[in-house]
């Protein structure tokens, strides 16, 4: 066991109360097979759990009286961890990927970048398409807008996503957001 600093508060136990930790005058007991036994004292419930070779676990502490069940606590914790891991595995964090273009981006470079855009959208990520202007290119913003409109048309044609934020100028760059369908 690791030492804790003398000024740190003691660790609070999380999770349901088990066996002797259940301190209340009476509990509503559910048997090992799921049958409702009724309202009994915690000591009587503990005896019944010991006879069955299982634990007494507080399922619903906020109920009146608290609901307890006779079950194998180790198995219960294992099942709970398995469910949480499954839920974590299923959830997907949406990331924002950025693809940078220039007003003079040529056809091959455009095709390569568009493949990346479509790949990111198929993986469920949002794509931020950035068009960077340098020097005198700022005078020809219509070329940049034309390129971004071409990107938007390409994405909607491939039915991979939809434009979430239309192109807008932010300083020396034009930005457009595309979300997956």
From Swiss-Prot:
Family: Belongs to the IF-3 family.
Organism: Cereibacter sphaeroides (strain ATCC 17023 / DSM 158 / JCM 6121 / CCUG 31486 / LMG 2827 / NBRC 12203 / NCIMB 8253 / ATH 2.4.1.) (Rhodobacter sphaeroides)
Classification via NCBIfam families: infC (TIGR00168)
Function: IF-3 binds to the 30S ribosomal subunit and shifts the equilibrium between 70S ribosomes and their 50S and 30S subunits in favor of the free subunits, thus enhancing the availability of 30S subunits on which protein synthesis initiation begins.
Entry keyword set: Cytoplasm, Initiation factor, Protein biosynthesis
UniProt-listed HAMAP family: IF_3 (MF_00080)
GO molecular function, one term: translation initiation factor activity
Entry protein name: Translation initiation factor IF-3
Gene Ontology BP, a term: ribosome disassembly
Coiled coil: none
Classification lineage: Bacteria, Pseudomonadati, Pseudomonadota, Alphaproteobacteria, Rhodobacterales
Main location as per UniProt: cytoplasm
Complex formation: Monomer.
Pfam families found in the cross-reference section: IF3_C, IF3_N
GO (cellular component) term, any one: membrane
Listed InterPro entries: T_IF-3_C_sf, T_IF-3_N_sf, Translation_initiation_fac3_CS, Translation_initiation_fac_3, Translation_initiation_fac_3_C, Translation_initiation_fac_3_N
Cellular compartments annotated: Cytoplasm
